[in-house]
Structure formats: structure tokens, C-alpha cells
Amino acid sequence: PLNFSQFQLLKNTFQNNGGTSLKIFELPDGRIPSGECSKFIVELVNELKQYNAKAEIAVLAFNRDTIRFLQKEIFSKSSNTEDVLVETIDRIQGLTTAFCIFFIPTESIPFALQINRFNVATSRARLCTLLIADKDILHFTTISEEVSNYFKKILQIG
């Protein structure tokens, strides 16, 4: 098990035994996270680096607008960005990292839930994956059964 006892944000966000967690925000329409969500991602990267300065962290999203915004936020506000990758899903196939933060903007929900891309995004981390999305993701009607079951499993564990 992972010992997050000294790291309140990690303890409240990830499971002690690793795996996938879900964090819901009220997100604006479009591709950019809310101020609250953006601040959370930066704080999470900072705390992961305090937990393990050498941790490899991937922050993933679908489109370049989101990535550019997150890169600017993370690289200007995080104290340690060594081994922090902020990139699109399509550019990271084959990548493995310790922690993965997968941001799904409201506009990208249909795209994010396509099974092949969802699988790529949720299978990058050796330790923990965090999905960050709007509350509407849980009620998306065209979600595949496999992805729907994945969300149900995450919600039961969390």
C-alpha cells in the first residue's frame, strides 16, 4: 500500500492501494478547467512531488488548448516539474508513469469515453490514476457498457 498519511491532498484523492480514482468538479463548458480545478491540479502535482521528488507524473487531456493551458499553469506554479509530462492522449501511447492525472473537459466527454482512447488514458500509471471530470460524465447516455462498468467500479471503491 501507498503511505499518503503525511499528505492530506493525496490521502483524500487517491486510494492507498493504488488504482483509479475519480474527482468531480463543476466545470465550465469548453476545454479549459475552472479556476478551482486548475488550482487543484497544480496543488496535486506539487504534493505528489513532495511525496516523491522523483515521481513521474503525466497530466493528460485530449486537445491542445487544454494542454497548453495546463502546461502554463503547472510549469509556472509548480516548484518541481522534473519528470512531469503534460500532453495529449494521442501523443503518449506506450508511455508508463507512476501517477496519471487525466483531465476530461466538458467539451471532450464524448471523445474521452470512446473505448480505445479511454483505455489508453487509464492504463498509463503504475501506481495511481486520477480522472477529473464534470459531474455530467456519470450521466452521459452514449457511454459504452465497458466504460460505464469501469466508472461503477471506481465509485464503489472510492
List PLM regions with ranges.
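Conserved helicase/translocase motor-coupling segment
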Residues: L2-F75, L85
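Helicase C-terminal subdomain and adjacent C-terminal extension
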Residues: L10-N12, N17-I24, I74-K77, F111-G158
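A generic local structural motif
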Residues: N46, E87-I89, N116-F118
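Conserved catalytic network of the ASCE P-loop NTPase/AAA+ motor domain
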Residues: Q50-N52, I92-L95, S123
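Conserved nucleotide-binding/hydrolysis micro-motifs of P-loop NTPases
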Residues: R64-T66, I92, T106-S108, K135-H139
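Extended hydrophobic-aromatic, low-complexity segments
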Residues: R68-Q71, L95-A98, A112
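A short, well-structured beta->alpha microelement
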Residues: N80-I92
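A short beta-strand element within the Helicase C-terminal
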Residues: E87, L95-E107, V120, L127-I132
